Structures are given as C-alpha cells and as structure tokens.
Amino acid sequence: MIEILIGIYILENIYMLYKQYKRPLGIFSPVYIVAFMSLGQMLPQLTTIYFLPQIYDRSIMYNLLFTMITCNWAFYLGSKKEYTSLPYKVLDIREKYIIVLIVLFAPCSYLFDKIVSAGHAGIETGADGVIAFQFQALGYISLILSLVYLRNHKLTPLLSGCLLLSTYPILHYAFGIYGSRLSTFIVALLYAYLFTIKYPQKYNIIRKVFTIFFTIGCIGSLSISEVRTNMGDETSGGIGNINYIENMKNAFSGGSYNYLAGMDLGNAALGIDHCYKENEFNWGLFVWNGFVFNYVPKRLVGQDVKDGLIVPFKSDKYIQYLTNGITCTTGYYDAFSSFAWLGFFVFYALARLFAWLKSRGKYSTFYMMMYFFMLSNVAVAITHGLQLVFAKVEFLILLFTILFFLLYRKKIMLKNL
C-alpha cells in the first residue's frame, strides 16, 4: 500500500508539472514550483524514509503520504480556479513613488551582504540574523518592483543600476558565503520573468532554459552539504570535484542520510505521528507564533513579554528536539499539525491567495509585487515550512502600514484591461 501511495504522489506531481508547463507563463505559477520541489527535493527524502525502516517505522508513512498527496492536490485545485470577475478598484502604489522605493531599497541588499559577511568572518556587528534578513527582504522588494515596473516602462540606466545593486549581493551570498539554494533560485526566477516581459516571443526558450536550470539545481541541491563545505576550499578541489550523480543515487536510496542531523521530511513524518498520537493540533496558530518570533522585537519588549505572546503547544518541544536548530519540518507538518487530515485546507487557502493576488496583479504593481515576493519563497514553504511564505505577507503588511501614504485605491477603467 505504501508503494502505491508513493506512486500516486509521483504521478500527481508529474501531472501538475506538465499542466503548468503547457500553460501560458506557467513557470511563474506556484504550482509549477511546488510540483518541481516535490519531485526534486521531497521525493528523495520520502524514499529515504521508506528504505530506512530501522529509523522511520513504516507505519508513520500513511499519515505522511496522505498529507503530502492531499496538500499538493488541494494546492493545484486552489490555483486552477481563477478569479474572473473584474475588480472595481485595486490597491496600488502611486506611480511617482515606485522609482523612489526601488532606489531606496536597492542598497538594503548590500547592507544584508555586509552584515552576513561580517558574521561569517566572526566579526560582531550588533545585528542578529532576523534584522539582517529584513534588509535582504527590502532588497528583494527593490528587485521585484523594478521588474514589475518594467512591464510598462523602458529599462533606464537608473533602473539598471538598481537591478545590479540589489542582485549582486544576493548572488554573493549564494555563491560566496553560504551556498544558498533559495537565493540562486530567486534570482533565476525573477530574471526569467524580466526576459519574458521584454522578449515575450522567446518564452518557449526561456521556459526550457529555466526548467533545465531548475533540474540541475535540484540535482546539485542533493549535494548541498558538500557544496557548502567545498565552496571556496581550493584544497578539496572546490564544488567541481563533487560527484553529484553518485550523491543523487544515495539521496534516493538512503545512503546519504545524516544520523546526527536527521532530515526535514523525516522530522515531518515523526512530528505528524506525534500530533496524531497525542491528539494535539494548533489550529493554524503556528502563523501567529511565527509572527511573534519574526516581528516582535525582544530588545524593545523584553524576552519574557515576547515568550508570553507565543501560544505554547506540547509538540513544540518535541519538534525542537527533532530539528535541533539544524533541520526543519516542511510545510506538510505545518498543515497536519494545524488541522490533522484536513490540513490540506491550509494549502488550498494559500493557493487561493496566490490566485487572488495574480488576478489583481494585472492592474496593480502592488499586488504583482506581493505575488512575486511570496512566489520567490514558495519553494522553501514545501521543504522548510509554510511560515516562510506567510512571513512575507506579514512583512509587506507591516511595511506598507508604515508607508500607507504611498498607496491609493485605483479605479479599474477599460483602458486597464
């Protein structure tokens, strides 16, 4: 039975991938990314669980596979149903301020790079990781705003400079400091969109190149530990001396399993089983707890106040034990720990949000910026946790609550169609 469920999961994601690939601009769909990550990142971990029954009892795979299959399918159905009604008004950024935001936020990528580089070198900066990544987020917003703005405007020297200023630090972090798969993916995704809007007649070539890049990235990601170890180490031959194909084979057979660190989907399987046996669910409050962790500053309110705002659950300690600050629990655990077998509603709701933003993004720079800001993180929503996407929504809400005077309600006229 387990083998049949694994087969269903594989076929489901192949179908989703094929359907999105054939759709116009389908590579910029969250379903395309989720299906790709499911096959390229989750499937090797799933087969590892299957081939290591001495670590992961086969019985825990039923709830895990049910959750994986239903969540992905719910996400597909939620994205498939488009909003067809024309909105009367949409929230948008006043056009005269778009360039201001692009120029203002572009240097934030550089600040992020300097903070992280200093930390990597062991230099004390006084800024923690959460603060550093908020600077990175602002740099991403500058990059995304530039691309969305270029839908209807020409590329100018100022925009070119902002694109370079916001992009280079991201690539430096990806290839020079940490070996970040997400940063590499985001740059590839956003620049694929840039080339698409500027050269729409070349979209067939762009989607093929992007798909090949994504495939190579998934293969390389299965060797991420060696990549990060060998990066910049000339004595080991660098990343070119890694046997990627052999590592890929080991990833599917359980041969690359780290007995000390564990793995993300394995944590999800054990965490789901724990919630099931303890009959304890958080009813979606993981989103609130994540908000408190990310955006309630302990330096202002104190650690005790911050801890008091978090809604505690018994499973939290078990998850901390499993992850040990090294690995994650995946978005599938977030779904099941919220509503048990009905956890797929979380994925469906997220897909509907994407569909809603996309429908309004046709008429609004603000909504399209939000769409791509979330889309750029949907890959890690599957592999790491859904909070990483919800946090982007929270960040934009907080940011534009402060910058509310830049927004206005734009009436949709026939000329906008």
What are these regions (language model features)?
Residues 1-86, 161-171, 187-221, 393-403:
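N-terminal "leader" segments that precede or initiate the main folded domain
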Residues 2-18, 45-50, 81-85, 155-159, ...:
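Hydrophobic alpha-helical transmembrane segments
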Residues 8-20, 140-153, 345-359:
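Hydrophobic, aromatic-rich transmembrane alpha-helices
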Residues 22-37, 91-100, 154-164, 358-371, ...:
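Membrane-interfacial loop-to-transmembrane alpha-helix junctions, especially the N-terminal start
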Residues 47-55, 114-134, 320-332:
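Juxtamembrane membrane-water interface segments that cap and precede transmembrane helices
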Residues 75-203, 212-232, 314, 415-416:
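Membrane-embedded catalytic interface detector for glycan/lipid assembly enzymes
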Residues 143, 176, 324-417:
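Hydrophobic alpha-helical segments
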Residues 218-347:
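Small-residue-enriched transmembrane helix-hairpin modules in multi-pass membrane proteins
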